[in-house]
């Protein structure tokens, strides 16, 4: 794994932190998902969202 990515990915808005390489970076749980992000609940968003760190609104 690349830098910053051992147990969990360190995220920044829109993707991984600068210099970090990871394939499993996901956004944190949120109130609701933005359109185009498929998830049944806010808790599932971080697990199933395909747009790292930018799928959640609010």
Swiss-Prot record:
Keyword Metal-binding: yes
Keyword match Metal-binding: yes
InterPro entries: Metalthion_crustacean, Metalthion_dom_sf
Binding site for a divalent metal cation 5: 33, 37, 55-56
Binding-site positions, a divalent metal cation 6: 39, 45, 49, 56
Intrachain S-S bonds: none
Job of this protein: Metallothioneins have a high content of cysteine residues that bind various heavy metals. The different forms of lobster metallothioneins may have different biological functions. Class I MTS in marine crustacea are involved in the sequestration of elevated levels of heavy-metal ions. Binds 6 metal ions. Known to bind cadmium.
UniProt name for this protein: Metallothionein-1
Species this chain originates from: Homarus americanus (American lobster)
